[in-house]
Every structure is written in structure tokens, then in C-alpha cells.
Amino acid sequence: MILQNKTFDLNPNDIAGLELVCQTLRERILEVVSANGGHLSSSLGAVELIVGMHALFDCQKNPFIFDTSHQAYAHKLLTGRFESFSTLRQFKGLSGFTKPSESAYDYFIAGHSSTSVSIGVGVAKAFCLKQALGMPIALLGDGSISAGIFYEALNELGDRKYPMIMILNDNEMSISTPIGALSKALSQLMKGPFYQSFRSKVKKILSTLPESVNYLASRFEESFKLITPGVFFEELGINYIGPINGHDLSAIIETLKLAKELKEPVLIHAQTLKGKGYKIAEGRYEKWHGVGPFDLDTGLSKKSKSTILSPTEAYSNTLLELAKKDEKIVGVTAAMPSGTGLDKLIDAYPLRFFDVAIAEQHALTSSSAMAKEGFKPFVSIYSTFLQRAYDSIVHDACISSLPIKLAIDRAGIVGEDGETHQGLLDVSYLRSIPNMVIFAPRDNETLKNAVRFANEHDSSPCAFRYPRGSFALKEGVFEPSGFVLGRSELLKKEGEILLIGYGNGVGRAHLVQLALKEKNIECALLDLRFLKPLDPNLSAIIAPYQKLYVFSDNYKLGGVASAILEFLSEQNILKPVKSFEIMDEFIMHGNTALVEKSLGLDTESLTDAILKDLGQER
């Protein structure tokens, strides 16, 4: 019926019917996410808002723009994907984010935060130029208002007065406890000159009254707070409505009708509860933001906890160990303290931890300034989000060679989050920047040594990367050794061909080495370690080998093999080099092993490729 694609069947006058739809949507979201994993609490909290949007607007004439879009599950269910929703985040299944190639109802690709208003402004401009009917409608979370791009877009929107509706989904939480959340932002407005001046004048008047009525002053202050949230937006030229109950369909429908009639920029402030409808998740924000498969009755994870430390945990433990001895160490993150492991530093040394909210550029620039003042900032950040701060890395850190330390988490193929979250670009863009030192560990033990090296390196910015979940190389296969600037490590010398691994690529190369040994082909194995600077002895190291095969989980263009080939060219060395890096395409979502197999990067495919290159068959 309604849920099979007929969004126009949602009757805005039938509130009881819409409430039943909301219940059905929540049941389906819980059913699928408990089986597949996904972004649960945000999607449950936004159900009524999305149903209200679909009840009043045709989303093909009035584009729906979901900020980040992890909260858009209800939208997917209402637009022909109710049955296929069971494939959510699965290989070749539905994406966990909006994706135009998946559905015509998904207007714009999303995955990173705070872009929705900027996209909406662009749509509104185009509609004005084309004299098209309709207006863009953006649904954004309170965490997204900490990013600069939001204010850049708001600045133009308020000036140009383009027709646009923004729904601010205020659940007092982005990904972690409310750094940059609306409640905190609005409390700052109360400290501003408008509020302070107005309040002081009224208090002055009230102070002349008898003491028996002085209670009016405090009552006034509380009343005035109710109008404060809209002041900021109204001053920018944006109509403000709210706050409203984001789970009250009657209020949502009536407010959207009003906003539609204004034909001007409007911000609707809707207050919602993350995890709404699933008691176990309500009020437990961070735990239920992004989840793996879980038991619906108990809320317990279906996956047993690994006894092996994740790379994030290995990094976090080592940083905490160093921070106990070195007071100059500070931790910086952009709204991801738990995901990057810095939550341990928060607990131990809260004054030396800085969550700058969703503001990656600010994270890098402010860290550069701290480095100039003699501190050792470890900027802990996902590879996919680091690209948002590229100019700050170049302009503020590298030109002045300030020793910030970039701890790049989720490097490589990350799995179910797909194109918008793969960590495949950092190698190519970082190695092109002068003064940047770049290296990568092969396992948890060498990751610990990488953190120690970064802490001691004080002559330039440095960056080290590590994967999500676990390294491909099992612990204890090779003895860990310390990092020496620009030095590689030859792990196995014997063989006619040389397998070169960088970072997590060492584990992949080692598995291929073992597979080839079963074919009576001996391979040497080199842990490149430093991509920049490369080992100055590299020409001597590779001299005995007929062919070189390079393994690394990053894009081939500008990647590790490119760096090696550039080095060989400068040395006038001719040597066959074959790259097993990622081809020039965006990589879809799905189980990491299945994605790697589809790319020919599993052990069997890699072994076959080398056998073919050597003129042998399996």
C-alpha cells in the first residue's frame, strides 16, 4: 500500500493514519538494523519529520536534502524500498545513505555532515533561474550547525531570500555528547550583546520597584530565554519557527504548511528524541548511533567481543601511556572522541583534550598553532574526514613545518558505509605536500611504535594511517621494531621477486607470499614503512629482485607504486613494478572481504594475478 512507493497516498489530514505509518516504519527499521547493523537512533528519531515532509510535498518537485543522510531510512521505506530494505548496507544492496543512483527520490549524495543547506541554496538558485516551481527542503541535525559550511550557506541564503525550508532536528546530540549541539550554541547567544543589553535595561527598571515584586526579574529572564533561539536566525534574515515537538504529527504538518506559504527561507526548529520508539535506545545516544547486529529483545550485540585490540584501541592505549609522561601531548578530534579512541584521554586528562565539533579545518589550524607554542597535538581523525581540512594542512601546518601529528583512522576500505567513507585518498594528497612525513604500521605492535615515533618527531608535520577493525597481518608474525625516519624493513630476503607492502598492505602481501610458496615460488617481503621520505637505500634493497609487486589500500593514482616508480626514474633504474592498489573508481559499500574480492584484492585473486604475470597458471 502506502509503503510501496505511493508517497502521495500519505494524507496530511489523517493524523491517525500517519501515526500508523510511523509505527510501521519504526518496526521495519528495527527489524532490519538489528539484523544488518546501521544508524539506528537517528533514523528512529526522524520518522515523524520525514513522514510529515512526504505527506505535504512531492519530493521530485521539492527536493528533499538529508544532511549526512544517515537518518533517512524512513525516506527510503516511503519511496519504493520497503522490501529491498532488508539488503541495507549489504554488498550490492541498499546504501545506508541517500544515493541518486539507487533511487530517483534520493536527490543528492550524502555521507559527510553539514552540506545540506549549501546544496539547498544551490537548488534554490537554479530554480529561480529556471523559474521552476517548488523549493528545496533540508533536514539537518543539531550537530551539523557547528561546521563552517553551514554558516557560509546561511549567510547567502539570508541575504538572497531564496525560498527554502530547513528543518533543524534538535536531538541535543551529533555523534558524541553535545559538543557543538544546538543547546550549547544557543546558550552562547544568551551571553551576546543583544540579550545582555536588553536584559540589563529591563533589570534596571525592575530594580526600582519594591522588593516584593523583584521576583519579576528572574521570571522575565526565564521567559526571555524562550525567544532567544530564533534571534540568531532572524537577524540573518531567516524566518524562524519553533521549537516544536518533532514527534507531534499535527504540529509538524501545520508548521510545514505555514513554512510552505511563506515562500522565503524558513528554519523550523524541531525537538526530537534519538532512538524514539525503542526504549532500550532512548536516551543512550552514543551507544545507539551506529550499531552492529543486535538482539532486538535485549539490545545485546550479536557479535562476540574480539579479544584482539583494534588498531584504534592500540593507538589510544599508547597515546594515553605517553601522555602520562609527557604533559605537552594534547588530543584533538572533530566530534569523534569515541570513534577515534580519544575518549580515554578525556577521562584521564580532560584539560588536554579538545573536541572542536564538526570543524575539521579548525581542528588542523588550531592544532598547528598549539604546535607552534610547543605542544604535541595528536589530531585523531578518520581518513574520509581529513580531506575536508586539506587547505589547513597545506597552509597552516606544512608551509611553516609545524609538528602536528595526524593519526589517520579508518584508512583503506571501510566496509558498509561505502563511497562517502572509504579512506583511500589520504596517501595521494598528503604525499604531494612539502615538509610532510608519511608512514604506516603493519600491525598493532608497530602501530604503538609509530605513535612513539610521531611523539618524538619535532621537525615537521607527520601522518600515520591504520585500518578499521583489524590489521590483515596477525600479531606476532614478525618481530616489532622501532621506526627510524625514512627506513624500510626487509622482512624476508630470499626470493627472485619482491613483494612490497605499505601499512595494512604488508599483511596482504604476506598472505600472497604464503600462497606463492605453496606453488614453489619464493618471494622476498619488504615493509616500506615510510612513504615520505622513501628509504634512501631503496635502490640497493630492490637490486637483487627481478620484479616488484606493491600492496597498499589506497588509490593507485599518486599512490605507493607511483612514489616508488618516481624514485626509480630519478635513479635511472629500470625495474618492472606492478601495483595492487585501488583503481580509479569510487568503491561501493558492503562487507570488506566481499568488496576486496570484487576488486581482485583477495589473496586468491592477487596470487593468480602474480602467477599470470610470471607466465604461470594456477
Swiss-Prot record:
Keyword annotations of the record: Isoprene biosynthesis, Magnesium, Metal-binding, Thiamine biosynthesis, Thiamine pyrophosphate, Transferase
Gene3D superfamilies in alphabetical order: 3.40.50.920, 3.40.50.970
Catalyzed reactions per annotation: D-glyceraldehyde 3-phosphate + pyruvate + H(+) = 1-deoxy-D-xylulose 5-phosphate + CO2
Molecular functions (GO terms): 1-deoxy-D-xylulose-5-phosphate synthase activity; magnesium ion binding; thiamine pyrophosphate binding
Any one GO BP annotation for this protein: thiamine biosynthetic process
Binding site for Mg(2+): 142, 171
Binding annotation for thiamine diphosphate: 70, 111-113, 143-144, 171, 278, 360
Entry keyword annotation includes Metal-binding: yes
Cofactor binding: number and manner: Binds 1 Mg(2+) ion per subunit.
The EC number(s) this enzyme carries: 2.2.1.7
SMART domains named in the record: Transket_pyr
SUPFAM superfamilies: Thiamin diphosphate-binding fold (THDP-binding), TK C-terminal domain-like
One GO CC annotation: cytosol
Record has Metal-binding as a keyword: yes
InterPro entries: Dxylulose-5-P_synthase (IPR005477), THDP-binding (IPR029061), Transketo_C/PFOR_II (IPR009014), Transketolase-like_Pyr-bd (IPR005475), Transketolase_BS (IPR020826), Transketolase_C (IPR033248), Transketolase_CS (IPR049557)
Family in the record: Belongs to the transketolase family. DXPS subfamily.
Record note on quaternary structure: Homodimer.
Protein's job: Catalyzes the acyloin condensation reaction between C atoms 2 and 3 of pyruvate and glyceraldehyde 3-phosphate to yield 1-deoxy-D-xylulose-5-phosphate (DXP).
Protein name: 1-deoxy-D-xylulose-5-phosphate synthase
The species this protein was found in: Helicobacter pylori (strain HPAG1)
Gene: dxs
